[in-house]
Amino acid sequence: MFTRRAALVGAAALASAPLVIRTAGAEEAPAQLASAAPVDLSNLPRVKHTLVPPPFAHAHEQVAASGPVINEFEMRIIEKEVQLDEDAYLQAMTFDGSIPGPLMIVHEGDYVELTLINPPENTMPHNIDFHAATGALGGGGLTLINPGEKVVLRFKATRAGAFVYHCAPGGPMIPWHVVSGMAGCIMVLPRDGLKDHEGKPVRYDTVYYIGESDHYIPKDEDGTYMRFSDPSEGYEDMVAVMDTLIPSHIVFNGAVGALTGEGALKAKVGDNVLFVHSQPNRDSRPHLIGGHGDLVWETGKFHNAPERDLETWFIRGGSAGAALYKFLQPGVYAYVNHNLIEAVHKGATAHVLVEGEWDNDLMEQVVAPVGLTG
């Protein structure tokens, strides 16, 4: 039984020596695999992708240029300290060093082949659970690796949509690893590309990936956020905050202000921008202040017709959604979680800087502010 005590003992032991921790799913999976018929994919082309940090996406085609391919990805698990806010730090566990992990993009019917690396300097076992995958706990049962190990997982992308992936090493480790930064998104495009509500093809000029995450940083007796030297040192204090279900921070892309100022997203009038938004743990309500969702796949699944002209859409905890908007006016747009307390007080805000010419037909200041006259 994977108890909290076992988790703490394991975390402490890993600080000095590798410890093999396997879930029940991981133990059962190899036996099941041994009896499975082999699959020959040697005739399929291989495409190697270089992942990039969010909010950006790696090079990809919106419409598949050929039949199915094997998409090769590599991700390193990086444990490191990150700064959430001016006075708050997190001993983060990450995919490829970013919160969220990179956006992966393939086409329906393709294969995803991931090499997952847990470097020897890490202190924890990790794995990956793809919500887009079928079987073995989304791959979690086949990918649990200790520091100094790597594993290669291949799965077929059988469903089109945006899907969360996250670390799920078992028991109380699962939520702790997720709120410590270990989540991301994979987008599986239909082979013939996205379609609008009438089934007509649509394209985007830019895709931005916004990964929303909730964090639980404990405070000391003086009300100061605590800072730890490694993940396991802060485990017990962090879990105490997690159990309140009240986050200390709710942020986009790993930190308060990560997507504002120098990190603000950019577009031009006339650009069609696809916003992919994931939240592995809590519900969210994205809203583009000054704009709309022209086409919104609220559940993120592209074979369902998109909704149109939404002001605010809903992202269920543990899922990803997508919204397409054509910018019609220049200026600064705020993309927020429209629980405005979470946007303003917790940090769930991004900015989009749009260049272009103003259209007075859409909006005009008829009279500038003037003093009232008696």
From Swiss-Prot:
Compartments, as annotated in UniProt: Periplasm
Signal peptide extent: 1-31
The record's account of how the chain is modified after translation: Predicted to be exported by the Tat system. The position of the signal peptide cleavage has not been experimentally proven.
Catalytic activity: nitric oxide + Fe(III)-[cytochrome c] + H2O = Fe(II)-[cytochrome c] + nitrite + 2 H(+)
InterPro entries linked: Cu-oxidase-like_N, Cu-oxidase_2nd, Cupredoxin, NO2-reductase_Cu, TAT_signal
Similarity comment text for this entry: Belongs to the multicopper oxidase family.
Name listed for the protein in its UniProt record: Copper-containing nitrite reductase
Native source organism of the sequence: Cereibacter sphaeroides (strain ATCC 17025 / ATH 2.4.3) (Rhodobacter sphaeroides)
